[in-house]
Swiss-Prot record:
Activates KDO (a required 8-carbon sugar) for incorporation into bacterial lipopolysaccharide in Gram-negative bacteria. It comes from Vesicomyosocius okutanii subsp. Calyptogena okutanii (strain HA). Belongs to the KdsB family. It holds the Pfam family CTP_transf_3. GO terms for cellular component: cytosol. The lineage of its organism: Bacteria, Pseudomonadati, Pseudomonadota, Gammaproteobacteria, Candidatus Pseudothioglobaceae. This is 3-deoxy-manno-octulosonate cytidylyltransferase. Gene3D superfamilies: Spore Coat Polysaccharide Biosynthesis Protein SpsA, Chain A. It is found in: Cytoplasm. One of its GO terms (biological process) is lipopolysaccharide biosynthetic process. Its EC number is 2.7.7.38. Keywords: Cytoplasm, Lipopolysaccharide biosynthesis, Nucleotidyltransferase, Transferase.
């Protein structure tokens, strides 16, 4: 199945400045993410960035890059501009892989593409079960709840589902959202005409605007390892430890 991976790569990061260029055993973090994407079934992998420093580093390790404007509030908006610049057909499947997901197994990228192709929902994404109680209470861990057919009901940094009675607490009901999305190019382009929803603004989660606009998002547990996304220094330390 033909599809492209686009990796939105922003230099500025309030919680971990310049994190995509941080060294992980001789390679910048963004290179690890790129190499995993290349090892998927993608026809092409593009790094979309608004910063020359990332462009230079990415070109040095052989990546295709596309410069975008710097004012975008989400990775999807950055990808939408790439699609317009490259005149990509509306029917093409695009996978949005966050630049700070250096341990995402390539098969997971293929999985989310297959999920999009075999479901009627406009967007597909992934999750994994939370097994650590501390992670459930961590606002850096985005939680997702979904119904029996895999349709997302809500994403939040808050503790969802909330257990009113302590005796009912069960991590088997708790899932962490994995920051990889598949959608048709035409769906992504619609983001350019959307206003960020109030929910996105307060939670800082772009997928909440898609839900607010009426898009259906398919969610499924990842079929393979997704490792650590890197949001803070502790995450980066864990990645270095696991890959050391």
């Amino acid at each position: 199945m033909n599809f492209s991976v686009i990796i939105p790569a922003r230099y500025a990061s309030s919680r971990l400045p310049a994190k995509l260029l941080r060294d992980v055993h001789g390679k910048p973090l963004i290179q690890l993410t790129y190499e995993n994407a290349v090892n998927s079934g993608a026809n092409r992998v593009i790094i979309a960035t608004d910063d020359k420093r990332i462009e230079v580093v990415a070109n040095d390790f052989g990546a295709i890059t596309c410069m975008t404007d710097g004012h975008f509030t989400s990775g999807t908006l950055r990808i939408a501009q790439v699609l317009e610049k490259l005149d990509i057909n509306d029917d093409e499947i695009i996978v949005n892989v966050q630049g700070d997901e250096p341990m995402l197994d390539p098969s997971v990228i293929d999985q989310v593409v297959n999920n999009l192709a075999t479901n009627p929902m406009q967007i597909a994404t992934l999750c994994k079960q939370i097994t650590d109680k501390a992670q459930y209470f961590d606002p850096n861990c985005v939680k997702v709840v979904f119904n029996k057919i895999g349709k997302a009901l809500y994403f939040s940094r808050a503790t969802i589902p909330f257990f009113r009675e302590a005796r009912d607490f069960d991590l088997k009901l708790c899932y962490k959202h994995i920051g990889v999305y598949a959608y048709r190019a035409g769906v992504i382009k619609q983001y350019l005409t959307m206003n960020s929803s109030s929910y996105e603004k307060v939670e800082k989660l772009e997928q909440l605007t898609a839900l607010n606009e009426g898009f259906d998002i398919h969610v499924a547990p990842a079929c393979a390892s997704v490792g650590h996304g890197v949001d803070i220094q502790r995450d980066l330390d864990e990645v270095r430890k696991e890959l050391g």
